[in-house]
Amino acid sequence: VWAYVNRFGTMRPYTYRVKATARGRVYSLPINLHTINQFFGTAMGSAEARAFVAAKAEQRDETASFEDYGLALVGRELYEAFLDGYTRKQWGLDPAELPASILKRLPLRFSYDDRYHDHRFQAIPAGGYTAIVQAMLDHPRIEVRLSTELRRDDPYDHIVWTGPIDAYFGFEHGRLGYRTLDFRHELHDGDVQGCVVMNYCDADVPHTRITEHKHFAPWETHDLTVTTTEFSRAAGAGDVPYYPIRLVREKAQLREYVARARAVTGVTFVGRLGTYRYLDMDVTIKEALDAAAVIRAGLADGTPIPAFVVDPLA
């Protein structure tokens, strides 16, 4: 993946770090040794903090729900301060109704490592993501058509569908549930929040986070700054679908669509929308490369090309 993206532009080293405002104070995220000492007003070392948090952890079935996993992981005080309110706003649901897998994506560290990700390679395109995508599409065998409706009876050798899987089948089993985002962009002088992202954990604050974009490129200098405030809500028919909900009802619908997809030929479903899964960027690129290899091999030797390279139900 790293070698692939570097073919299309210069990547600048960048470490994504997030701060959080909770109960009127600013903390380090994801929850780490600094967060714990900040929150409890202590100066514990790693081993002491690990034992301290373990003593506060509740005995819960960690697989039952987001809430159960969170309380079993960090105890009620840290859970209610940093996880409960933010999650209610982001998903519009009680955390007791959400799967534990959502929280398992975030680390708990007993060190002062406040990186949001611990991947080996962490960077951002020096010229922005638009330039990277433009370079990917700049190929003599690629034709880009905008505002073009797909008709399934058109004579394509094979379709790679990255749109919503339910939309491909005309929503015949109903619309899959998504959360969408509303953005409020503002222009300011100077520097507003001093960091790239500030999460707002309290449930009574309507927005989930504020992004100050110039901090994504610390090698640049700007007198002005743009902030974007995010508000999460249920996605409607005309909204951009961001986060698949994947609760019991949605999983039942998804099974119907997956069965439908596997019964047709000439199309492969990929990506967040095509497989109705929450995917990070590196995973998305890896799955796209894998799908391309499978499709190319199938077209070359005439073997059946699967509807999915990765099982959406796994």
Locate each region found by the language model.
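A short alpha-helix-loop-beta-strand transition element characteristic
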Residues: 2-23, 78-81
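Active-site/ligand-binding neighborhood in enzyme catalytic cores
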Residues: 20-158, 162-167
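General small-molecule cofactor/ligand-binding pocket signal
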Residues: 12, 143-147, 268
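Mid-domain catalytic core of redox enzymes
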Residues: 148-260
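C-terminal lid/capping helical subdomain adjacent to the catalytic/cofactor pocket in oxidative enzymes
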Residues: 174-187, 196, 253-314
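Active-site catalytic microenvironments for nucleophilic, acid-base chemistry
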Residues: 7, 139, 294, 298
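Pocket-edge structural micro-motifs
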Residues: 22-24, 30-31, 212-214, 229-233, ...
